[in-house]
């Protein structure tokens, strides 16, 4: 009867949804720039053949835990066979020098890598505070406000408090930033000033409405 037909329809639908017809055959990684997309895909190899409806977030999380550069991710099932993994990478702000070498960190102080040689294009962070200190947090906000290409020109950033951040560019130019307040405006003012006055040796943008140049 009708009830039997409906039951068969439901059972058939479940069999299709949870069976091999809707299993993972393609894994698409989106959002990687510093990470090797192939390595991330390989780490999720165990998901191939798993029905899309049975892809377990905790299993995926465990597979991605070995990539410290991943800040967050999301999963999207695209029937019949595609699993899309959207990655949000951590933004490195610079390196901290220690006896073990040069440690690349993000704005939260998460260690992304350690190497014996200083990575190119990464500013050296000089501060006595740890990752939870006001000065480190302020440094992170200031560096992240800079355009990526300009950030690569920063050789060193120092701060003894949250109110005396200073940058030294690879050209030797010194820029006094002050606090992390108005960082977006300070970033705009600094980059424009450096572009207009490439021979300046010192730029104070702590009060972005009244820049001091020498």
Enumerate the predicted regions with their spans:
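N-terminal export and membrane-targeting signals
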Residues: 1-5
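Periplasmic polypeptide-binding modules associated with outer-membrane biogenesis and secretion
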Residues: 6-35, 42, 51-101
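Envelope-exposed proteins and targeting segments
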Residues: 23-25, 36, 56, 60, ...
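Flexible glycine-/small-residue-rich
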Residues: 31-33, 87-91, 169-171, 179, ...
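Solvent-exposed, non-transmembrane alpha-helical starts
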Residues: 52-53, 94-97, 132-137, 176-179, ...
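Extracytoplasmic/luminal low-complexity segments enriched in Pro/Gly and acidic/polar residues
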Residues: 180-214
């Amino acid at each position: 009867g009708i009830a039997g037909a409906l039951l068969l329809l439901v059972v058939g639908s479940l069999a299709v949804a949870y069976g091999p017809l809707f299993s993972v055959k393609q894994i698409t990684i989106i959002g990687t720039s510093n990470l090797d997309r192939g390595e991330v895909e390989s780490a999720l190899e165990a998901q191939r053949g798993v029905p899309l409806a049975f892809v377990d977030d905790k299993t995926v999380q465990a597979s991605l835990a070995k990539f410290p550069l991943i800040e967050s991710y999301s999963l999207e099932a695209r029937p019949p066979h595609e699993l899309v993994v959207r990655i949000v990478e951590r933004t490195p702000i610079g390196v901290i020098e220690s006896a073990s070498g040069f440690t690349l960190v993000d704005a939260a102080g998460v260690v992304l890598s350690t190497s014996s040689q200083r990575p190119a294009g990464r500013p050296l962070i000089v501060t006595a505070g740890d990752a939870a200190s006001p000065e480190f947090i302020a440094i992170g906000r200031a560096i992240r406000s800079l355009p990526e290409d300009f950030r690569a020109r920063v050789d060193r950033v120092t701060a003894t408090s949250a109110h005396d951040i200073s940058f030294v560019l690879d050209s030797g130019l010194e820029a006094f930033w002050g606090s992390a307040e108005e960082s977006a405006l300070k970033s705009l003012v600094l980059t424009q000033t450096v572009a207009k006055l490439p021979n300046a040796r010192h730029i104070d943008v702590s009060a972005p409405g009244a820049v001091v140049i020498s």
